[in-house]
Amino acid sequence: MKKTHRGVSFGTVFMLAVTIVVTGLSASILPRLLGTADLHMDTAALSALTLDGAIPALTLSDIPINNAMSEPSATPEPSDSATQAPTPVPTPTPFPGGTVTLTLGGSINIDDAVRKSAYYSESKKYDFTEILALLEDELSADLTMLSLENITSDAHQVSALNAPPVVFDMLAQSGVDIVALGYPKAVDKGLDGLRTTVAEAQERGLVTLGTYNSETDAATLRLFTIDGVKVAFLHFAESVTAAGKKAISGERAEYALATTHISGSEAAMLADIREARAVADVVVVSLNWGKVSAAKPTTAQQTLAQQIADAGADVIVGAGTRVVQPVTWLTSKDSSGNIRQTLCAWNLGSLLNESRKDGNVLGMLLQLQVFFDGKSISFEKACYTPTYIWRYKQDGQYQYRIVPSDQPAPDGMGDDQIGYMQKAYKNIQKYLGDSPVTLREK
């Protein structure tokens, strides 16, 4: 593009004028500064610097003066936004729910031989604490529950029914939190025997289920909060002996033993489960039921278990048969029509008893990891530890220890006992069959 010719700008003219003035002043001042120096400037040449009249005459009015020294503007007032406090960062909303681990075991039976093994003649005292010592890691969980099929009353002579109260020391020191006391013979020594048993357990910090010292105690839901997850435990006995019925009716203390089939108690049981469902995130229902040594549940048990699942149970565990029975899923719908899954372990067997029959020397610990997302639960882990009742002689007296049968034999176990333990392990795998639980990983 052709550029347009532009004239001499005003700025250029101004600068040339200043240069001429400075040059003239220098001509008059320098001789004085230099003394004898002879300085001569041709005025004709100086006039030539005017570019032959190209520079017009200038006056001050012709020179624009920028207002560079104008008064500063007033300091701006701070705006409202500058004085406002910073917006606080909102506190993160806590994540609803969490994870809880449960270990649920079968029954403890302090039979005569077991009781005698824990008696020390020198001190004339009982000490059961070593019996579960080899199982402490497996019993560890946020909440651990076992069943006891004995009463503990100092007012009565010790027997296969009445165990020394220090049996609760064994449970408490092994990490057990909850003990289910309801079973058919729980009131065979009257309500005093039942109340003493409950009191002995509670004095050692154990939470009791199934038998109660008062109506208030019976009406109090056993509710625990672990990692933000509310877990409810309930326990019921399938039946009660004639002696127990007489003791209960004599004092009109129907609250003392929670049952499933006595005088309309089934409806009361289901109502209790529904109430627990309304306030808990996880509901565990424990039952003492079934026929001794039966390999599978009866039709009546299956019907009752489905009713319990429909009422809101998430986990059902049984004890009382002294043998392990399968584990299965039960399907039901909640009040909103959503499909629910209930894990049902028909029977966990006996953790401790004196019998040496193949089915009675083994048991299992059901170990669960349950996650609650704020709305519903899921079973992150459903596994088991198989147990074996190791009996051996020491100083002419039998001793009992409960050991995990899938692990290496403990020190001191003879070859014959190792063989029995391995057999027990194979049997429990057979009993569980296609059950949805897996062997616990160490």
PLM regions and their residue ranges:
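Acidic, metal/ion-coordinating pockets
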Residues: 2, 10-20, 24-71, 76-442
